[in-house]
Design a protein with these regions (language model features):
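A short, proline-enriched helix->beta-strand linker immediately N-terminal to the Walker B motif
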Residues: 61-70, 76
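H-loop/switch region of ABC-family ATPase nucleotide-binding domains
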Residues: 103-104
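Conserved ABC ATPase "signature" C-loop
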Residues: 121-122, 137
Length: 155
């Protein structure tokens, strides 16, 4: 099935429980957020992973969900779009949405989360306040944490 982004917006919106009328009303807002208007009629199979993520995130966040699960959604795409998505998640959280963010970016976890569950090989290694869990994680490999840009070190 070679759906275009336009068709995918309607399909995924419907899967999320949105009516075609609601999708019609929010279509431009979805497309504008994704910044992919010129690619709307291109089959998704020709999209990069970052482009697919843009469309998916824009659709999933057009409503004010009770819970948003963002599983590595920001691991693809450019920095500016990641920032835009983080801001959208902050807006949703301030409106009462619970965001479950799955990420390998310690910096992103520090910026976005207040509680963290650290998983290692599928098991809970640590759970608690974000600052405490992130500090424990960075203590294991401060060099890797510095590479991710989340730790300032003195020489």
């Amino acid at each position: 099935m070679d759906l275009t982004a336009r068709e995918n917006i309607y399909l995924n919106g419907t899967v999320l429980g949105l009516t075609p009328k609601y999708i019609d009303e929010k279509f431009d807002e979805i497309v504008d957020f994704s910044e992919l208007r010129e690619f709307l009629d291109v089959p998704l199979k020709n999209y990069s992973s970052g482009m697919v993520a843009r469309i998916a995130f824009a659709i999933a966040t057009i409503t004010k969900p009770d819970v948003l699960i963002a599983d590595e959604i920001l691991s693809v795409g450019d920095f500016m779009f990641q920032e835009k998505c983080e801001e959208r998640m902050r807006q949703l959280m301030s409106g009462g949405t619970t965001v479950l963010l799955v990420s390998h970016s310690i910096g992103q976890i520090e910026r976005m989360c207040d509680h963290v569950t650290w998983l290692e090989k599928g098991r809970v290694k640590m759970q608690g306040e974000a600052a405490e869990v992130c500090a424990a994680y960075k203590a294991l490999d401060p060099e890797a944490a510095a590479i991710q840009g989340s730790v300032k070190t003195k020489k």
